[in-house]
């Protein structure tokens, strides 16, 4: 099967980042035997995998390598915590692969994702489209057609992962006003609503699960 031949460094960089995220998450889960936390982690990691895979940031071979790496580094008993993750990921890889002739504007999409990763605190669709010298509606259409997500989906997902890093490194629940501002949200209420809509739990509930 053909693989997307994009920027090798960019592809490897994100595959490594994803591997690191899963490693940290698994290590955390194995210390805390809480089923609900495992479900939350599965959801977030799968969401991240889908975003990166659909964006062709890493291809099928790298995704398969990721699953092999998980099995090499964790026992079957440990992987039981994330059994559904592995199954769902395999299914997703098999069912969502699209031929390259349907993949258009890869450079444009890759650039947009890179900008979101690097400037998530202040980036907006208008500024990004201006930098690319294209119409915002055209950029939105390209992202939707190729990644099956919106600009805001990508931006909110990135910000949520940054918020999770805050939670994992905080001994007490961060004040939402400060966290929201640091992430680039206009208010704590807006951040709260976005987090709850994407994760299914409130920031407070997630922090308590991660710190239990």
Give the ranges of each region predicted by the language model.
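Hydrophobic, helix-rich cores of sensory/ligand-binding and other regulatory modules
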Residues: 1-95
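Conserved phosphate/pyrophosphate-binding and hydrolysis machinery centered on Walker-type P-loop NTPases
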Residues: 34, 79, 102-106, 125, ...
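Terminal helix-turn-helix DNA-binding modules in bacterial transcription factors
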Residues: 113-118, 145-186, 208-212
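Short, Lys/Arg-enriched anionic-surface-contact patches
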Residues: 96-108, 149-159
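Basic/polar phosphate-binding segments, predominantly the helix-turn-helix DNA-binding elements
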Residues: 92, 126-158, 180-206
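The cytosolic transmitter module of two-component sensor histidine kinases
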Residues: 37, 82, 105-109, 176
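Basic, amphipathic alpha-helical hairpins
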Residues: 71-74, 90-101, 111-124, 142-147, ...
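Amphipathic alpha-helical repeat elements characteristic of tetratricopeptide repeat
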Residues: 16-23, 106-110, 157-161
């Amino acid at each position: 099967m053909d693989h997307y031949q994009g920027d090798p460094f960019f592809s490897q960089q994100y595959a490594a980042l994803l591997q690191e995220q899963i490693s940290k998450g698994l290590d955390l889960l194995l210390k805390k035997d809480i089923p609900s936390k495992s479900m939350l982690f599965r959801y977030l990691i799968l969401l991240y995998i889908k975003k990166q895979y659909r964006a062709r940031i890493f291809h099928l071979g790298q995704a398969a390598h990721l699953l092999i790496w998980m099995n090499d580094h964790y026992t079957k008993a440990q992987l039981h915590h994330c059994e559904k993750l592995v199954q769902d990921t395999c299914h997703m890889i098999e069912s969502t692969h699209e031929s390259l002739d349907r993949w258009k504007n890869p450079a444009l999409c890759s650039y947009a994702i890179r900008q979101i990763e690097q400037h998530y605190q202040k980036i907006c669709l208008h500024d990004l489209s201006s930098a690319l010298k294209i119409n915002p509606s055209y950029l939105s259409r390209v992202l939707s057609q190729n990644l099956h997500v919106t600009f805001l989906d990508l931006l909110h997902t990135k910000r949520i992962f940054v918020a999770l890093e805050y939670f994992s490194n905080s001994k007490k629940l961060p004040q939402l006003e400060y966290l929201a501002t640091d992430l680039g949200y206009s208010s704590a209420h807006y951040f709260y609503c976005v987090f709850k809509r994407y994760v299914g739990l409130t920031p407070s509930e997630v922090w308590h699960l991660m710190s239990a």
